[in-house]
Amino acid sequence: MLCMFAVLLLSVFSVVAPVHGLVVEQFRAPACERCAGHRGVTIATSTDDVVCAAVAGEIVFVGQVAGVAYVVERISADVRITYGQIQPLDSLTVGQQVDEGQPLGLAQSRVYIGVRVGTRPVHPLRYLGLAGARLVSSSRLLGVTRTRSR
């Protein structure tokens, strides 16, 4: 029910690809809260590419965790987007409202994008509507290139 509400909520928002690049590590849901997995996607980018907010929201964290820089944006009461491995803009502050497409920082050679609904990680590209079957390649239109399944 919560996930359905969040999908409905996102359907009224406009979404942009946060960064251009190739998905080099796919989402792998963990079997349990502390189990191994990859709770987002990793996108290979060009260093210093601009990383933008996928959806309008509020910045709730800007800082480092274990030496890696992160920006976390709350887009609804229970949904957060995490942008990792970026150099946040100096002007970005906790509590700041950001618009969809607004620059958050600069990419390193890779950028991590994760989405959580409550405490549960969900596939960020599918959740944000940036992946899925299309008659026209959305990856070129949206700036995200997916790797082929093997």
Where does each model-flagged region fall?
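Acidic, glycine-anchored pre-beta loop/turn
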Residues: 62, 89-98, 102, 119
